[in-house]
Amino acid sequence: MANTADVIIIGGGIIGNAIAYYLAKKGTDVIVLEGGDHIGNGGSSRNGGGVRQSGRDPRELPLVMYGIKNLWPSLSEELEVDCEYHQDGNLRLGKNDKHKQILEGLTERAVKVGLDVRMIDGDEVRRINPYLSDEVTCASWCPTDGHANPLTTTLGFYKTARKLGVRFITGEKVIELKKIKGRLRQVITPNNIYEADTVVVAAGYESKEILGTVEIDVPMSRVLIEALVTEAEPHMFDQMLGTAEADFYGHQTKHGSFVFGGSSGYEAVNKDNGTPICSSITAPCICRGIMKYFPDLADAKIVRTWAGWADQMKDGVLSLIHISEPTRPRLI
């Protein structure tokens, strides 16, 4: 039947596309349902492109470290697309004692899990990146971090998964998961009913409402983050950059333009009309933060800005759960 598969994946972002690709490599019959008109139109295409291990909760590190070591180095070749992956390190910058305490805590916790990350002083920071302001007094330095292009990477997973037979259906908003004889079997949309032995919910913030239809409560929220891209500039540096208090983050692309992201601090109290819309105050806030760290970028011209939702769990840690109760088998 056209509406049946071994696995149905709900969500067409980079996570859904990647899961579909790796399952299809093993010969699994997969359907991906995406509620929007296009794949990757959420956070997957709106983020700053960081491929990092540093600055994370230690519970995330084993999975992330595996990906950095085993997946990313050969991903462009495997997907036959330029993911623009650069593994040139990550500097998380600080200017004062408070910043240093934050960075030292993150570093100590990561080292205990086995990550190669260390604290460095301002002089060593500027040896790595001579464009940084003299105000920078410390940083955490993870040489195996990097950055990539989230657009081409998502598209690469999508195209390669399609070649392997994955069926992608856009404009199919899932409104309900349904059990038959006590077992989860059906995925309901306004126009169709789909059936599979296994259902993977990877729909970002929308996962909360979808899982609620089978009485699974997900403590999740979303935060509006904005990003900007500049005109192409002469090559300056290759590292991924961030700050202790997350004022901004970003990198220089292979094409010369800079991509930076961040927030103003007012996003939580701004009006939420259901769509990610840029605020008039956020880009100036990001730019002021950048100029304090990179005076040489003061005259860089912004080409465009955009906004996107950052989906996050209550504790800020990604959630990967296999629901194995008798009444809800094969739900991930």
Where are each of the predicted segments found?
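N-terminal Rossmann-like FAD-binding beta1-loop-alpha1 element of flavoenzymes
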Residues: 5-31
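Glycine-rich FAD pyrophosphate-binding loop
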Residues: 24-44
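Central helical "cap/lid" subdomain
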Residues: 40, 192-237
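Dinucleotide-binding Rossmann-like beta1-alpha1 core, especially the glycine-rich loop
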Residues: 48-128, 247-249, 274, 289-290
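Short beta-strand to alpha-helix junction loop
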Residues: 63, 93-102, 141-159, 275-281
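Helical element adjacent to the flavin cofactor pocket in flavoenzyme catalytic cores
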Residues: 144-197
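Active-site lid/adjacent beta-loop-alpha segment flanking the redox-cofactor pocket in flavoenzymes
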Residues: 234-319
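Single conserved hydrophobic/aromatic residue that forms the stacking wall/gate
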Residues: 321-332
